């Protein structure tokens, strides 16, 4: 072995390479000169073959003279002495001529026999028949395939130490997969197809691989610019007698070494996908779509394994003797593998093949028709029901199970059959008589769908159109159509007082009619609308502005002077009330519960998504013939939200919680299919994007979202970082206490009793920890979960204005301040040391005294905490100008700047500023008033009866007050504020759905101007992490049923991310 190659090959590696050779061949190879070895440079073989440069080196050196002497004589007789079948025989067995070539000087013993067998097995003809590549030592008369004579016969220069060509490599060359074709196959194969998944291994980027072109590649470009090494040379073409389709001519490149049989067999059994350890260059990362999808599936499984392992570690690590060290090792291994897989898959590129692997059929464009709603066959649904097994197999248990199963199948069958006459999107109802405005097409279709739904059981459904698509006007049109007598004949012939629940539960009726606490039968009424308080006047305003006079009468049932008897409510066509009033009157069953309503409408029905709440229980007990739920988000937290709506609709038997959990919400594919059937038959949902893509909502203007990033100034950032440091410390203490609390609970449980050694040694580590936890639990310094949330609140308020934390503490915690009733009498304080108490108390100006006072009610502060407290002594005091509310913060300045330069500068544009805190809106109002900007305010302090007047005043084009300060909770739902086309979100909320509802106050049907949403975010703060949390929640949207967003609740992982831990 030469010194140049010594750094690449060791003796062990050399032995492993030639391990498959016989002993005699090894002895012959050892007598080869070093110069002969260096003269043989490795060359690639056909696609997928691993090249071994040590193969046949002795044959090339020993038979070179013999081959040269016999080449001329044999070439003259090759045409006359061989037939096509002889050539075929040579392709599958060793050549007789080659078997007789024996090098001189080799003794004829047992080793010679092994050498002869080795030569037969590795003869050029054998390798030619297997690989389809002509070896260099095969003379011209051995095959009838024409080869180019441009192959370099002489030796090449030995590679230097700096540029040594390794024996094995894992690199592809260029876009070789676009030009390679499989050469290993049946003898009677046709023109070979592209082998896009071949695992081609080329020895070096500096070498030219073999180019094998089919007969159809005449016009293909042979010089690939992005390929490594010299360009390909076009080989001459001829037809092989072994291929009836005309197999392409194979031209070998320069400096090729011959493949081995083992390498060929290895390639025949190797997978189509490239091995991850072999991919290094960009061109090697081209894979088929099937391989890419399979790798993505494996990556998803790996992520699930990592997540499961982490959850297992959190639950059982503290219970194990090794404290979960083995599980942690497994987690580390999985994380490393996951990181490698992600890095590898990110570099993959799906190959765009010109020849499709399967036949692609373009769908024919049919005339528009109603979409197929029934995607499941009834046999599949019924079989899925039969898969559920009873829990109790006794006589009573089986009877109950069979009864539930029969009711479930009957109800599903009715819903499945009802889909047969479901009106398609092209079915539109006429505008009812007395309506001043014309309905849009999607509203007309909703009116037709509602008329169809009221003829089925249950009578009613869920209108889940996107926010701002006119659900209120659609329902008013339905009420007007009912009064005009435009209902179907089934509705006229039926008893208007029949209740869907009464149809299913006859036992609830007595002979004399419906009885409740000894009073007479309830009275027949019109339509009851239950909505949030902020929408009371909007319903009244919609009826007055959209319906002709005297067509519909409206009563707002709200306030202390509302009617207390139902007989005074039955004469109105529409009675509007709130969820709070219904829940209050539910206790005495008065007023609204004394009327049997023709129609009950729940506006913003997601308010009652908790089926255990008082409002949900109250609305479910209301009596009515038709029951409707209006909501843009039927699911906000979980699938159980749908159960609350089905309970209100009285969709038997799924309005029973036990039946719901057993047959619907059972985490199975069958349960999901049954839920889909319920939603397809009971719910109608259209989004703005869907209607715009279908061309049915061309009147809606464009919507633009702008993210405004703000950097806090130096003073504000100092305050923020100080509070953040304390917050992280307190949160870490909270996590520590939480972990110890779980350990203590495990100690108390029977399944986790202390061991004998622990009992024997009462001073062990476990008991020390337990005593420490008991002392901590008994002290006043235990951190509660609400303390953590309050800290997050303080951090978010600092982003809006640092003065909010002082004002909030001074306002809300004034009762704990003792005699300090005014700012002038209150001494300087250390907010950091007292922040966890959420109160303002006396502290000394000396830092050490401050630390001592902080420890009066608990353990003293740690040295680090004392140092931080001392450093922040002057920073977190009222005398700091940053807490002055008259000083505009960075965010307030940016809001004022945008209002002046981008919005108010226009002649008629209006803006709405939304915030979660009215204190922020008050600060902004004061600064705007100094600049002469008049504003309107709508928040929780405004009486409900006056809120609609403020909305009407703001929507008036002639009104000069062009800025509305809106509270997110008071006015973020249901209001129609299309008078403005700019919305400024001052602060970010955990639940992005609330922000989306606020945006739809201006982006709704009737808006004529382009809408611009401004979202303000302070960078390098908790707001930036909240933005990431919002994006994650939006990515987890449940689009199967409604497209609604996931829960707004914060988890421990969310809190860790917010605190940067």
Swiss-Prot record:
Domain Helicase ATP-binding, residue spans: 452-652
Gene: lds
Lineage, opening ranks: Eukaryota, Metazoa, Ecdysozoa, Arthropoda, Hexapoda
Similarity annotation: Belongs to the SNF2/RAD54 helicase family.
Protein name: Transcription termination factor 2
Annotated GO biological process: DNA repair; DNA-templated transcription termination; female meiotic nuclear division; microtubule anchoring at centrosome; spermatogenesis
InterPro entries cross-referenced by the UniProt entry: Helicase_ATP-bd, Helicase_C-like, P-loop_NTPase, SNF2-like_sf, SNF2/RAD54-like_C, SNF2_N, SNF2_RAD54_helicase_TF
Originating organism: Drosophila melanogaster
Bias (Low complexity) ranges: 32-46
Record SUPFAM superfamilies: P-loop containing nucleoside triphosphate hydrolases
């Amino acid at each position: 072995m030469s010194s140049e190659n010594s750094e690449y090959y060791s003796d062990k590696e050399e032995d492993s390479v030639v391990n498959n050779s016989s002993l005699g061949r090894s002895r012959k190879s050892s007598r080869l000169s070093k110069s002969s070895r260096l003269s043989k440079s490795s060359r690639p073989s056909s696609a997928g073959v691993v090249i071994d440069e040590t193969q046949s080196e002795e044959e090339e050196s020993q038979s070179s003279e013999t081959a040269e002497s016999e080449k001329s004589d044999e070439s003259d007789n090759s045409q006359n002495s061989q037939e096509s079948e002889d050539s075929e025989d040579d392709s599958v067995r060793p050549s007789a001529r080659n078997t007789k070539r024996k090098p001189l000087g080799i003794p004829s013993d047992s080793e010679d026999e092994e050498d002869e067998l080795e030569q037969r097995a590795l003869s050029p003809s054998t390798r030619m028949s297997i690989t389809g590549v002509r070896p260099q030592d095969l003379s011209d008369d051995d095959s009838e395939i024409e080869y180019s004579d441009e192959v370099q016969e002489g030796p090449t220069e030995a590679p230097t130490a700096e540029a040594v060509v390794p024996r094995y490599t894992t690199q592809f060359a260029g876009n070789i997969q676009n030009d390679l074709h499989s050469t290993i196959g049946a003898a009677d194969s046709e023109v070979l197809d592209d082998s896009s998944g071949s695992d081609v291994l080329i020895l070096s980027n500096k070498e030219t691989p073999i180019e094998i072109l089919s007969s159809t590649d005449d016009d293909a470009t042979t010089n690939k610019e992005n390929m490594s090494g010299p360009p390909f040379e076009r080989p001459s073409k001829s037809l092989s007698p072994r291929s009836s389709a005309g197999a392409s001519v194979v031209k070998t490149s320069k400096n090729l070494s011959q493949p081995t049989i083992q390498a060929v067999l290895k390639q025949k059994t190797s997978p189509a996908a490239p091995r991850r350890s072999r991919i290094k260059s960009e061109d090697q990362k081209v894979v088929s779509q099937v391989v890419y999808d399979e790798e993505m599936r494996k990556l998803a499984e790996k992520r699930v394994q990592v997540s499961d392992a982490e959850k297992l570690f959190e639950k059982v690590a503290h219970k194990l003797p090794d404290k979960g060290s083995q599980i942690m090792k497994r987690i580390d291994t999985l994380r490393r593998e996951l990181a490698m897989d992600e890095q590898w898959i990110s570099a993959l590129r799906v190959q765009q093949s010109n020849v499709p692997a399967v036949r692609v059929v373009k769908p024919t464009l049919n005339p528009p028709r109603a979409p197929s709603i029934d995607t499941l066959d009834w046999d599949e649904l019924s079989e899925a029901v039969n898969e559920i097994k009873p829990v109790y197999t006794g006589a009573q248990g089986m009877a109950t199970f069979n009864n539930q199963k029969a009711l479930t199948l009957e109800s599903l069958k009715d819903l499945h059959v009802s889909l047969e006459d479901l009106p398609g999107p092209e079915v539109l109802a006429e505008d009812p008589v007395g309506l001043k405005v014309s309905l849009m097409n999607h509203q007309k279709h909703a009116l037709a769908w509602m008329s169809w739904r009221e003829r089925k059981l249950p009578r009613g459904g869920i209108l889940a159109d996107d926010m701002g698509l006119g659900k209120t006007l659609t329902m008013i049109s339905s009420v007007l159509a009912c009064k005009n007598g435009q209902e179907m004949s089934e509705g006229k012939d039926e008893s208007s007082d029949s209740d869907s629940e009464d149809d299913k539960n006859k036992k609830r009726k007595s002979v004399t009619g419906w009885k409740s606490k000894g009073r007479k039968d309830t009275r027949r009424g019109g339509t009851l609308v239950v909505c949030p308080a902020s929408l009371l006047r909007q319903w009244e305003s919609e009826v007055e502005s959209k319906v002709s006079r005297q067509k519909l009468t409206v009563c707002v049932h709200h306030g202390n002077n509302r009617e207390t008897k139902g007989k005074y409510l039955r004469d109105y066509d529409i009675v509007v009330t709130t969820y709070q009033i219904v829940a209050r009157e539910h206790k005495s069953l008065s007023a609204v519960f004394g009327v049997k309503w023709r129609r009950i409408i729940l506006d913003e029905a997601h308010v009652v998504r908790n089926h255990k709440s008082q409002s949900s229980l109250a609305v479910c007990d209301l009596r009515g013939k038709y029951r409707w739920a209006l909501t843009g988000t039927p699911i906000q937290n979980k699938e159980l939200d749908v159960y609350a709506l089905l309970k209100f609709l009285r969709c038997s038997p799924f309005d029973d919680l036990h039946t719901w959990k057993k047959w619907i919400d059972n985490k199975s594919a069958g349960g999901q299919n049954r839920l889909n059937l319920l939603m397809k038959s009971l719910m109608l949902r259209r989004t703005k994007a869907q209607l715009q893509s279908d061309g049915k909502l061309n009147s809606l203007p464009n919507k633009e979202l702008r993210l405004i990033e703000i950097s806090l100034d130096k003073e504000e950032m100092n305050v923020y970082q100080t509070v953040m440091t304390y917050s992280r410390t307190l949160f870490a203490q909270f996590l520590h206490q939480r972990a110890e609390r779980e350990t203590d609970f495990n100690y108390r449980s029977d399944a986790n009793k202390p061991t004998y050694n622990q009992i024997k040694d009462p001073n062990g580590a476990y008991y020390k920890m337990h005593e420490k936890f008991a002392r901590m639990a008994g002290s006043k310094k235990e951190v509660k979960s609400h303390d953590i949330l309050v800290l997050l609140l303080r951090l978010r308020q600092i982003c809006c204005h640092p003065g909010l934390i002082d004002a909030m503490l001074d306002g809300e915690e004034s009762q704990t301040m003792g005699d300090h009733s005014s700012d002038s009498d209150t001494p300087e304080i250390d907010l950091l040391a007292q922040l966890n108490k959420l109160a303002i108390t006396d502290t000394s100006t000396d830092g050490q005294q401050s630390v001592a006072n902080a420890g009066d009610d608990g353990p003293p502060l740690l040295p680090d905490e004392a140092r931080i407290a001392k450093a922040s002594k002057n920073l977190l005091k009222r005398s700091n100008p940053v807490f002055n509310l008259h000083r505009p913060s960075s965010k307030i300045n940016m809001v004022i700047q945008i209002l002046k330069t981008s919005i108010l500068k226009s002649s008629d544009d209006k803006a709405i500023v939304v915030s979660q805190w009215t204190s922020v809106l008050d600060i902004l109002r004061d600064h705007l008033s100094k600049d002469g900007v008049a504003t309107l305010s709508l928040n929780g302090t405004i009486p409900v009866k006056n809120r609609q007047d403020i909305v009407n005043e703001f929507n008036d084009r002639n009104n000069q007050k062009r800025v509305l300060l809106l509270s997110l909770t008071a006015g973020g739902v249901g209001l129609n504020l299309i008078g403005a086309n700019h919305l400024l979100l001052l602060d970010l909320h955990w639940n992005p759905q609330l922000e989306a509802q606020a945006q739809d106050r201006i982006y709704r049907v009737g808006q004529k101007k382009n809408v611009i949403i401004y979202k303000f975010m302070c960078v390098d703060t908790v707001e930036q992490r909240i933005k990431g949390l919002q994006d994650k929640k939006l990515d987890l949207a449940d689009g199967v049923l409604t497209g609604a967003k996931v829960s707004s609740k914060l988890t421990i992982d969310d809190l860790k991310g917010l605190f940067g831990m």
